Amino acid sequence: IYFDEMRFMLAAQMCAPNSPQWFNTGLHWAYGIDGPSQGHYYVDFETKKLVKSQSSYEHPQPHACFIQSVQDDLVNEGGIMDLWVREARLFKYGSGTGSNFSKLRGSTEGLSGGGRSSGMMSFLRIGDRAAGAIKSGGTTRRAAKMVTVDIDHPDIEEYINWKVVEEQKVAA
């Protein structure tokens, strides 16, 4: 029943799915379009297990926005550089992403191996540049990215000032 109701609502223009659905859903089923796995996962409804996709179009990403976590770690899974890879995967197929970066050390905080952290802002600038370079879904619009930071983060003032400058660029 759900399948028939969804088809009716689409045909009657009563609803429209998120952009990743418009971009990708049905391409494999209707046209046989396929591509190599890009590191996505899907839930197998028969086994109820998370399965790594073998194709980039057979089980496309279903949502326009993903909230992702990031740890205060440079290169390991769940860390800063891993986040950029995960974001690129989502941007490629038309989705946006958001994260709270409050777990990252501030620029005045020490590192376990000695020295000081380069700070949260240095990594936010990298992520901003990476997102700006990617055309979301292969189209002309740029990737959508949301950044949040807790008010008690050591670099909060620098973050707010950076956001003001970026908003002024958009307004110009």
Where are these regions (language model features)?
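Extended catalytic cores of very large enzyme megasubunits
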Residues: 1-172
